[in-house]
Amino acid sequence: MALHDENVVWHSHPVTVAAREQLHGHRGVVLWFTGLSGSGKSTVAGALEEALHQRGVSTYLLDGDNVRHGLCRDLGFSDADRQENIRRVGEVASLMADAGLIVLTAFISPHRAERQLVKERVGHDRFIEIYVNTPLAICEQRDPKGLYKKARAGELRNFTGIDAIYEAPDSPQVHLNGEQLVTNLVSQLLDLLRRRDIIRS
């Protein structure tokens, strides 16, 4: 916290989270997709957002690459920068969930501690950790951006899964098999959202 924090006061507003959720017709939550590069995080999150949008659900997808074009464009890939990247995304996701949106985030977010901090910021009742579990060998075969090839050749350092660690979730709320069809995974997630009374249809 900064030194001037004693002069910064939280202001409550008359429009509550519950009122916003009532307007949207569903709860505001954060769906946090985590997994290796190439695991299918962004693909599944994008397909789920499309399915929710077709059902009239208010959503927003925060993608790991996209936020580095603006919100996090000043950050690199050191451990400190990765931590700050996730902290910023967590803050934005929390604000969007407060606005009543279903926020989908697709980030490697390799460290458990960082994901836990986001969970605490968002609130345990509004944070759903979704682990897209895809074997490293499959991720390397997919390699949509050619990053694994560069990492194996020594052209890309500190790459998660090769020379930087990925800490898989101990007990994610959702554990997806990243080798399954995307349509099957989306169906599983829609069922979960219905069971938890996050969406109605």
Curated annotation (Swiss-Prot):
BP terms from Gene Ontology: hydrogen sulfide biosynthetic process; sulfate assimilation
Query: What Enzyme Commission number does this protein have?
Result: 2.7.1.25
Pathway membership of this protein?
Sulfur metabolism; hydrogen sulfide biosynthesis; sulfite from sulfate: step 2/3
Active site annotation, chain numbering: S109
Record keywords: Nucleotide-binding included? yes
Q: Pfam families given for it?
A: APS_kinase
User: Domain of life of the organism in this record?
Assistant: Bacteria
Instruction: From the UniProt record, list the reaction(s) this protein catalyses.
Output: adenosine 5'-phosphosulfate + ATP = 3'-phosphoadenylyl sulfate + ADP + H(+)
Which GO molecular function annotation, any one, does this entry have?
Answer: adenylylsulfate kinase activity
Name the top EC class.
Answer: transferase
| Alphabetical keyword list | ATP-binding, Kinase, Nucleotide-binding, Phosphoprotein, Transferase
UniProt binding sites for ATP: G35, L36, S37, G38, S39, G40, K41, S42
Role according to the record? Catalyzes the synthesis of activated sulfate.
Similarity-based family: Belongs to the APS kinase family.
The entry's protein name is: Adenylyl-sulfate kinase
Q: Source species, please? A: Salmonella typhimurium (strain LT2 / SGSC1412 / ATCC 700720)
What high-level taxonomic lineage is stated for the organism?
Bacteria, Pseudomonadati, Pseudomonadota, Gammaproteobacteria, Enterobacterales
Q: Which gene encodes it?
A: cysC
